[in-house]
Amino acid sequence: MRVEQIAAKALKKLKDDRYKLALVVAKRAEELANGAEPLVNLDKNKYKYTDIALHEIAEDKIVLEGFVETSK
């Protein structure tokens, strides 16, 4: 699958919130850079950490916690 398709699938998992997607990808990419193992079958030496993070989100391997939505 192309990166654009993976990004679109990951975005849908986060209810089309680009800001949340950017935060989750950045945090997970940082974890991967610091030695965390990928939760999907991708080689860390071949793929960028951000691409691995997108794949993980798209395949429901990563869930977003810690955001609380309030009603106005």
From Swiss-Prot:
What's one GO-annotated cellular component? DNA-directed RNA polymerase complex
Swiss-Prot/TrEMBL GO biological process terms: DNA-templated transcription
What's its EC?
Answer: 2.7.7.6
Gene Ontology MF annotations: DNA binding; DNA-directed RNA polymerase activity
Reactions catalysed according to its record: RNA(n) + a ribonucleoside 5'-triphosphate = RNA(n+1) + diphosphate
Q: Does the keyword Transmembrane apply?
A: no
Identify the keywords attached in UniProt to this record, alphabetized: DNA-directed RNA polymerase, Nucleotidyltransferase, Transcription, Transferase
Q: Which domain of life is it from?
A: Bacteria
Q: Which Pfam families match?
A: RNA_pol_Rpb6
As for family, the record states: Belongs to the RNA polymerase subunit omega family.
Complex and partners? The RNAP catalytic core consists of 2 alpha, 1 beta, 1 beta' and 1 omega subunit. When a sigma factor is associated with the core the holoenzyme is formed, which can initiate transcription.
Please describe what this protein does: Promotes RNA polymerase assembly. Latches the N- and C-terminal regions of the beta' subunit thereby facilitating its interaction with the beta and alpha subunits.
Q: What is this protein called?
A: DNA-directed RNA polymerase subunit omega
